[in-house]
Amino acid sequence: LRQRLFEKINLFNLIATRINDNIKYYGDDIERLRKEYTRISFLIPVISIISVIFYLKFSKYFLLLDIMNFFIYFYPLLITQIRKDEQRKIIENEIPIFLLFAYVNSLLGKNLYKTFEEIRNSKVFKGLRREAMLLVKEVEVLGKSSFSAMESRAKVHRGDFLGKIYTTYTSGESIGISMPERIKDLLNETIDNLNLNFGSYVEKVNELVEILFMLFLVTPMILLAFQYISSTINMFELIFPLLLFPIIFFYVSLIQPNIGYDIKININEIKKSLYILPIPFIFTFLFHLNLEYEILLFYSIFIVFSFIVYRKISVADAVLNNLPYILSDIADYLRIGYSIKSAILKLNVDSTEFKKFLGELVTKIKKNEAMSNVKTNIWIVNAILELIENIDKKGFADTYTFKDLSLVLNNYILLRKKVLQNLRMFNILAIITPIIFYFALGVMTKIKAVGNLDLIIVLYSIALSIMYAKISRFTIFNFPLLVLVLVNLILILFF
């Protein structure tokens, strides 16, 4: 009876089509997911019983544990939808360079399927490499022709830009349209599509500001006002809105476009950063600090670590911003008869960061090693190196291809700069948040003595600084922003 009841309420049986469609998009083993879901489903009654016991014994807030049951029950739908959305975002970021691969191949008489076969062995493409594996699987395992396999994948990707590429190619092949020209048109469209995605993100986070303001500023004020009738302050109730922080942060991660950072931290950097970790514990042990000061110390350690990551981001941006001019110079050298590698050896730049990158590239060429072995902390640069190497192997040193590549990359950089410019307001909000809390809580405490509320100022300021850093710079490691927030907090707490 229990088994039959479980089958009736099993989410796999209720919305199997939706889950299956999600899995088809990114590729997964549905039976493995089903077994995983069956195992974790038995946690639902356990959590319910624990929440009721803790509610009766300790506090009503333990009933909030039942929220976990919602996520467990909808786990198959949530996890497949998240993976699908992540795959879609990665693919959208990779499409411009992929289309340049396809464009070069079309000039050499190779079709789109051949491009996917090449991408399947790529070390750089992640989303499209997975897509290539699924496409090739339909041909090699299911016995479809490459044309019908692309038609099948077009249906899976209906509504996104990759689906449009599939449809455009298959329809173009049917009626004999020139594919190089059509792919160039798609290149322009994909830049427009990225622009729309960035614009949509800016609109969504601007709307989110109102929610953040209500939750993390107005709500604590209201809760504090309600506690005026009591002689004591319930700190848990005042910080209760912060429990929603992970959900909002997760939402921001879902709606954010992929900006392309691929930060790698080596083991030596991790070892160096570990030396400063004991500092907060030592200070706490020696000086018996209040909780707000302990939190501030740990926040300071986080900021130190963020400098390592932010430095890598800055270098990656510098390399990216100089690359269009270098590609244009390579095109000029190709015009007068140089090969791609000899053109790179002739290059000269002023930027310190790019000079180091170029030095690594020259070293690889002189050692006759793959150019794509030079890795940066930004995906699009790594992908362009793989594209250049691919073009060089094919002996297709075409001036116009490099000019087009330079133009596409320059448009991409302008889009990134535009969206970062539009999000600067969040940096200002993060910096002034401690000041707003200081004055708002200061007014409240003057009306009635309610004790020290420094902990509230610290917790909300740190939470919002991390949130705004994520929103405005697409990473929580926005070192300048975090430092300014820390300085404000120190001034407020100590002066």
Task: Locate each region found by the language model.
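Membrane-interfacial amphipathic helices
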Residues: 1-56, 75-85, 194, 208, ...
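Transmembrane helix interruption/hinge and helix-loop junction motifs
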Residues: 55-63, 231-236, 284-296, 492-495
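Short amphipathic alpha-helical segments
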Residues: 2, 25, 487-495
